[in-house]
Curated annotation (Swiss-Prot):
Belongs to the SLC43A transporter (TC 2.A.1.44) family. It is a multi-pass membrane protein. This is Aromatic and large neutral amino acid transporter 5-3. The keyword Transport applies.
Length: 504
C-alpha cells in the first residue's frame, strides 16, 4: 500500500510470531492464488518487528478513527456487496466440466474432428470426437496457467496502484475474456486469448476486497473466511450458465455468456466504481499483549544472536528461498498442481458415473476449506497438508480399483476427496509460508510458487492428450506416484518444522 495512512496503521503492536499466526488463520480460508500483496495485510517486515510496540502508541489515534466508506454505507452493506462481488468474479472456471459441456453443445472445436469421425449418438453436451475433447480441455490448461502466473501481478497492482484501480483492471480483463469467449466460433477463434484474459483478471479483481475485512476489527479472519467461501461458491456460475444454455429453449452460447458479462460482471463493475476505495481501508490497530511483547523481545534476541538483524534484501531472499524449509515446498506444490489440473477436465473419463454430481459437489468445497483452516490454526499447517495430500492419494488409489472407470460408489467418494484437496489447494501454501518465514519475502515466495507452478502445470496438456489416445490408466498411476512422493516430502517438512519452527 502506498498511502501514508494505511502504512501507519499496519505497524501493529504484534510480534513477528503472533503476526504470522494471525495471517495463517486469515489465509487458511482463501482458496485461490496469491500474489505479492499478501505481505501487505496486517504483516510488517521482519525488521519492523522490534519497533511495532513503539509505533502502536503513536498510531493508536489514527487506528481508532472509523474508516470512511463511500456514501456513508454501513459496513454490513459493504460486506454483502463484496461477497456478491467475490461470487460473481471468482474462479468459476475451476468447475471446468460445466463450461466444457457448454462448449461441446455450441460446437466448439468440432471442426477438429476428422471426416466421418463425429459420433452422432452422444448427447449434445458431450464430445463428438477425441480431438474435440482434447482441444476443449486445452482451454482449461490455458486458463489455469494464466490464473496462477498472473497472481503475482495482481498483488503488485494492488500494492502500487491501490484497490480501486486494481479491481477495475482485473474486471477489465474478465469482461474482455468472457466477451471474447461469447463471440468465439469457428470463424472467430478467440477461445485461447479469452482464457488468458479470464485467468489473468481473477486475482487482480479479488485482492482489492481484502482491505474490506479491516472494517471489522477483531473479525478479520472471519471476514476473510467469508470471502473465501463465496469464491468457492463461484463454481455455481459455470453450472448456472450450463443449465440455462442446455435447458432453456432458444438460449444461445453467445447470449448466455454475454448475459453473464452484463448482469454478473456488470454488478461487479458497479461495486468497483462506487464502493471499493482508492486507498485501502486501514487495518485495525490493537494494544500489544504481554505475550506479544515477549515474542517481540525473543525474536529480536534471536535475530541478534544469529547476526542477521540487518540482512540486505538479497541476503534475506537467499536465506528463505534456499532454506530446507522452503526447497521441498516447491516440488510438493508443483506435483499437487499437476494432479489436480489433470483430474479437473478429465472427470468425464475418470468418474463418469459421478460426473454431474461432481459439478455440484465442487461448489461445496468452501465447507472443508473453513474446517481445514481451523485445524491449521490448532495443529499447524503441515498436518493439514498431510490430510489434503492423503485425500488425493486415496482418490487416485480408488480410481484404479478395479480399473478405469472404478466402482460407481468409489467415483462419488473420489469426487468428495478431490473437492477436499482442491478446497485448500493454494491456501496451504499461504499458511505454510506465513507460519515458517518472516513477512519480508512472503509475496515473492508465494508469487514465485504460483507463477512457476502455473507454467509447469502446462505438462497436463500432453498428459491428457496421451490419455485420450491410449487410455487413462498410465497417467492415473503417475498421479498416484506423485501423491506418494508428496507424502515423503511432507514427512520431511514435518520433521524439519519441529526442528526449525521459524527460519531466522
Amino acid at each position: 500500500m502506498e498511502s501514508t495512512e494505511a502504512t501507519m496503521v499496519e505497524r501493529k503492536a504484534e510480534s513477528p510470531s503472533s503476526g504470522d499466526r494471525a495471517r495463517s488463520i486469515e489465509l487458511a480460508h482463501q482458496p485461490t492464488g496469491a500474489g505479492a500483496s499478501l505481505s501487505s495485510f496486517e504483516v510488517g517486515g521482519a525488521k519492523q518487528g522490534v519497533n511495532k510496540a513503539q509505533d502502536s502508541a503513536v498510531n493508536k489515534g489514527a487506528a481508532n478513527t472509523p474508516p470512511r466508506v463511500a456514501f456513508g454505507l454501513s459496513r454490513y452493506v459493504v460486506l454483502v456487496a463484496y461477497c456478491l462481488y467475490c461470487l460473481l468474479s471468482g474462479p468459476s472456471f475451476m468447475n471446468w466440466t460445466t463450461i466444457a459441456d457448454s462448449l461441446y453443445k455450441s460446437g466448439a472445436f468440432e471442426w477438429e474432428c476428422k471426416p466421418g469421425e463425429i459420433d452422432t449418438s452422444v448427447l449434445p453436451h458431450e464430445p463428438k470426437c477425441p480431438e474435440q475433447e482434447v482441444s476443449v480441455n486445452h482451454l482449461f490448461t490455458v486458463a489455469s496457467c494464466s490464473y496462477f502466473v498472473f497472481a503475482m501481478l495482481g498483488g503488485i497492482m494492488l500494492d502500487f496502484a491501490g484497490p480501486k484501480f486494481g479491481a477495475l483492471t482485473g474486471l477489465a480483463c474478465l469482461i474482455t475474456g468472457w466477451t471474447l469467449f461469447g463471440f468465439s466460433s469457428e470463424s472467430f477463434r478467440a477461445y485461447v486469448p479469452a482464457m488468458v484474459f479470464m485467468g489473468a483478471g481473477i486475482d487482480m479483481a479479488f485482492f482489492p476486497c481484502l482491505c474490506g475485512a479491516n472494517l471489522f476489527p477483531g473479525m478479520v479472519a472471519t471476514i476473510i473466511a467469508v470471502y473465501g467461501s463465496f469464491r468457492s461458491i463461484s463454481f455455481i456460475v459455470g453450472l448456472s450458465l450450463r443449465t440455462i444454455y442446455i435447458n432453456v429453449e432458444g438460449a444461445t452460447f453467445r447470449g448466455v455468456m454475454l448475459g453473464y458479462v452484463g448482469a454478473g460482471l456488470g454488478f461487479c463493475l458497479l461495486v468497483a466504481l462506487f464502493i471499493i476505495p482508492r486507498r485501502a481501508w486501514p487495518a485495525p490497530d490493537e494494544a500489544p499483549s504481554a505475550s506479544a511483547e515477549q515474542d517481540v523481545e525473543a525474536g529480536a534476541d534471536a535475530l541478534a544472536q544469529k547476526g542477521e538483524k540487518n540482512l540486505t534484501a538479497i541476503q534475506s531472499m537467499k536465506r528463505d528461498f534456499l532454506s530446507l524449509s522452503f526447497l521441498p515446498l516447491f516440488p510438493y506444490f508443483v506435483l499437487v498442481l499437476i494432479t489436480i489440473l489433470f483430474f479437473a477436465p478429465s472427470a468425464k473419463r475418470l468418474i463418469p458415473s459421478a460426473y454431474e454430481a461432481n459439478q455440484i459437489i465442487s461448489i461445496f468445497s468452501f465447507v472443508p476449506c473453513i474446517i481445514l483452516g481451523g485445524i491449521a490454526d490448532r495443529l499447524g499447517i503441515v498436518p493439514v497438508m498431510m490430510i489434503c495430500n492423503t485425500c488425493g492419494l486415496l482418490s487416485w488409489i480408488l480410481m484404479l480399483i478395479p480399473g478405469i472407470p472404478c466402482f460407481a460408489a468409489s467415483q462419488y467418494i473420489v469426487s468428495i476427496l478431490i473437492s477436499i484437496q482442491m478446497s485448500f489447494l493454494v491456501s496451504q501454501v499461504y499458511c505454510y509460508v506465513t507460519e515458517i518465514f518472516y513477512p519480508e519475502n512472503l509475496g515473492k515466495m508465494i508469487g514465485f510458487l504460483c507463477s512457476v507452478g502455473g507454467i509447469i502445470s502446462l505438462v497436463t496438456d500432453p498428459m491428457r492428450k496421451y490419455s485420450v489416445d491410449n487410455g487413462f490408466y498410465t497417467m492415473t498411476v503417475l498421479c498416484l506416484i506423485f501423491a506418494l512422493i508428496n507424502e515423503g516430502l511432507l514427512l520431511f517438512m514435518y520433521v524439519r518444522k519441529r526442528k526449525v519452527p521459524k527460519v531466522l
